[in-house]
Amino acid sequence: MRSPAPSLPDIIAALATAPGRGGIGVVRVSGAALAPFARALTGREPKPRHAAFTHFVDAVGKPIDEGILLYFPAPHSFTGEDVIELQGHGGPVVLQLVLARCLELGARLAEPGEFSRRAFLNGKMDLAQAEAVADLIEASTVVAARSAVRSLSGVFSDEMHRLTDALIDLRMLVEATLDFPDEDVEFLENARALERLDAIRVKLERVLERARQGALLRSGMNVVLVGQPNVGKSSLLNCLAGDERAIVTDIAGTTRDAVRETIAIEGIPIHVIDTAGLRETADPVERLGVERTWREIARADVILRIVDARVGPQPGDDAIDAALPEGVERITIFNKIDLCGLEPARLQHDDGVVIQLSAQLALGVDLLRSELLRVAGWHAHGDDVVLARERHLVALRDALTHVVAARSQCGALELFAEELRLAQIRIGEITGEFSSDDLLGVIFSRFCIGK
């Protein structure tokens, strides 16, 4: 079970807005008994949940800035502790002065994710919801952001709690019967235990598939464009991105370094990487670009092998194909079909899918977008998906393995009950009901400072 919240008497403070200049900057403070802290900082008594225009003053009462003071007494705050927010002007110098004054008054700088960690430890949110805070901040598409909001509101956690409740109910029945070994078989039949177990398995499979879709929304996939020089890799990147991000010329070898662009296809972030043309070259700069291309290929989820449709695959293309890593999805692109009379098409060949298109005229590019979604395994609707992380997928897969194992142990209730217990623990790790301090440290250390 989750450990009781430790005593956290210290006060933490941090900038809650991004570094740089802006119209407004926010300093957030959390801790115990912050009313005297607010009085020392503003010279006035803070009123709970009331926006007060005031001066923020230094140790001798000299104004540092003026702005809005918000005071949220415990437990009705984000962290469950007293929280104050100081909303002032968004200049980096003045914000640092306000933050320094907070430190003078006894606060310390918050660690990354410490506000969210305190919210979790004080029961204001579970671990999946806390992770959704970071995912919402980092969301790169509208669909991903909306899915993160659903996770933050507890939709994903509610599913985990329903699965946990079903496992607990079944465990209670099993363990209550362990004192009567002669009735094991009758119990399983009369309590419809296997029926209940099968229902849990079906629910787990559905949740796992939705989590896979959510993980795809969160992380997207890396797509690397490879091919010989001047086959239209940069033109294809620009076409997909809708912008001239890569230099396009008739001179072979123009792209010397990887050019990255993230595009959204039905809300899925697709990280497209245009690379240097793969060929033998004496140019040391171009040769360095080719070496970087191979490093990008090693990290690819999908490789788009670009070929000039006017001439088809060349001997150099065979060498490239032979050197590509095994197990990585490949799509062959016949580009420049507008120059040779071919029509846009998706063709299934023995060695994989071929897309005929013209990047220059944007003909057939929708076929490529659809193929990328198919390869990614995306078949959900954004409104049904909640964001998930790799650790969620691992926990759900493990829980499913234990549920399946329990089905095979229906003749031995002790083993049956143990598999149910292990499945419950794995699901509980998602919401933080069962979590080690090491896991919490890793998760919250990846948050930004002010959350």
From Swiss-Prot:
Enzyme class: hydrolase
Cofactor(s) this protein requires: K(+)
Primary residence: cytoplasm
MF terms (GO), sorted A to Z: GTP binding; GTPase activity; metal ion binding
Any Pfam family hit: MnmE_helical
GO biological process: tRNA methylation; tRNA wobble uridine modification
Binding positions (K(+)): N230, T249, I251, T254
PROSITE patterns: G_TRME
Domain TrmE-type G span(s) in chain numbering: 220-377
Domain of life: Bacteria
List of residues binding GTP: 230-235, 249-255, 274-277
Its EC number(s): 3.6.-.-
UniProt key word Hydrolase: yes
Intracellular or extracellular location(s): Cytoplasm
Keyword Secreted: no
CDD domains documented for this protein: trmE (cd04164), TrmE_N (cd14858)
Transmembrane feature ranges: none
InterPro entries cross-referenced by the UniProt entry: G_TrmE, GTP-bd, GTP-bd_TrmE_N, GTPase_MnmE, MnmE_dom2, MnmE_helical, P-loop_NTPase, Small_GTP-bd
Subunit structure, interactors included: Homodimer. Heterotetramer of two MnmE and two MnmG subunits.
Family: Belongs to the TRAFAC class TrmE-Era-EngA-EngB-Septin-like GTPase superfamily. TrmE GTPase family.
Stated role: Exhibits a very high intrinsic GTPase hydrolysis rate. Involved in the addition of a carboxymethylaminomethyl (cmnm) group at the wobble position (U34) of certain tRNAs, forming tRNA-cmnm(5)s(2)U34.
Name recorded for this polypeptide: tRNA modification GTPase MnmE
Protein source organism: Aromatoleum aromaticum (strain DSM 19018 / LMG 30748 / EbN1) (Azoarcus sp. (strain EbN1))
Lineage of producing organism: Bacteria, Pseudomonadati, Pseudomonadota, Betaproteobacteria, Rhodocyclales
Gene symbol of the encoding locus: mnmE
